[in-house]
């Protein structure tokens, strides 16, 4: 039994949260810009990236001035996109504010690959560990091009390929296929912090 719910947060790009209705106690989606904004409004918190710029990997780590959780690519982004450019200590502060904690690496892996729900949908089997966070196939595992599958929109989801108005980057949270334990974006989108 977990002492505190898990806060799923990403490194320079960010995820977070915990819910009782997902077997491993992790929220279904990454922490959004909107959710992180609530934390900032309540606490007056300021991130390092707001002062010094965000880090991106372009054949090596590069600092991008004005890139931060509010402006992931130097421009304002919608509140349903994942909060990014968050350091480990900032992720810990956010989790603590929510009464949560970062998952241990093995907890994150188990949540993303081993079905733990008591009554999962027919496409999943309780106790089974899958090769991909979406099950037996990488299709829908949150690759920008659907991991090579056809690019038709997923039923009930926005056409997130068109939504990436920058032409690159991450998708809004929860726009991809629901995977193991009903979680989204465990196959990519942004990097998560774990202990």
Region roles according to the model:
Residues 7-15:
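Bacterial N-terminal signal peptides
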Residues 24, 36-39, 94:
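Conserved hydrophobic/aromatic "anchor" residues
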